[in-house]
Amino acid sequence: MAIVKCKPTSPGRRFVVKVVNQELHKGAPHAPLLEKKSKSGGRNNNGRITTRHVGGGHKQHYRLVDFRRNDKDGIAATVERIEYDPNRTAHIALLLYADGERRYIIAPKGVSAGDQLIAGALAPIKPGNALQLRNIPVGSTVHGIELKPGKGAQIARSAGASAQLVAREGVYVTLRLRSGEMRKVLAECRATLGEVSNSEHSLRSLGKAGAKRWRGVRPTVRGVAMNPVDHPHGGGEGRTSGGRHPVSPWGFPTKGAKTRGNKRTDKMIVRRRK
């Protein structure tokens, strides 16, 4: 994987930094694992904007990724290829199981075409294998972690993400997340060893607004540039600072205000994130 800084042959190329991976598959994705992905433009069934800054972008297909890996225990799989996925920052790996079935998984770092992976209690401790947390040694790095047994991976799924298993006590294990949070998870839950691929994703620079539009992201207008009818920060004679602590268009505090409201799982958090 290489970091390529483009030559400033035009204003749009001047700040472009690309992450080039020669191992990525250059052909079409595996068609049986594709699904139609329709665009909403951020609108709901009434045609009203419910998510701002969404719209346009290149047409995409959704790749069906196996986040559970719980119904192929003990069946060896060969990594056929590593692919780009427009729906996520991580790369995906196409597995060919010994029973002939193919599935996509989130590609772990260091896994390449031809490698053998397996899931289940007897799986060896190596990157890409999926086991229950009770069978993973303390100190191991994991990703794709379940919060409920059988529900599928929910934590550490994006590019370069991982967590460290720091303790095991009774029916729970304790994980240290990248945010600094220490959290208890049921030892029955599954996780994949290693960290997620494409950790260089954060080093890239799109270089121009148009590259963001290709990805379906529309511009963000500052509140102080709006009229009072549109935003609490709007209006005023000349340029203003908004005149109050930063709020959303609906008046809720933003820029650092705590938004976590799930008290039900507070007991699982040993230490809050930094």
UniProtKB/Swiss-Prot annotation:
Query: Where do transmembrane segments lie in this chain?
Result: none
- Region Disordered, as annotated, extends over 28-55, 224-274
Q: How does it assemble?
A: Part of the 50S ribosomal subunit. Forms a bridge to the 30S subunit in the 70S ribosome.
**Which Pfam family, an example, fits this chain?**
Ribosomal_L2
Classification lineage: Bacteria, Pseudomonadati, Pseudomonadota, Gammaproteobacteria, Pseudomonadales
* Biological processes per GO annotation: cytoplasmic translation
Q: What is this protein called?
A: Large ribosomal subunit protein uL2
Q: Sum up the protein's function in the record's words.
A: One of the primary rRNA binding proteins. Required for association of the 30S and 50S subunits to form the 70S ribosome, for tRNA binding and peptide bond formation. It has been suggested to have peptidyltransferase activity; this is somewhat controversial. Makes several contacts with the 16S rRNA in the 70S ribosome.
Alphabetical UniProt keywords = Ribonucleoprotein, Ribosomal protein, RNA-binding, rRNA-binding
| Gene Ontology annotations for the cellular component aspect, listed alphabetically | large ribosomal subunit
Q: Where is the composition biased (Basic and acidic residues)?
A: 263-274
Q: Name one GO molecular function term.
A: structural constituent of ribosome
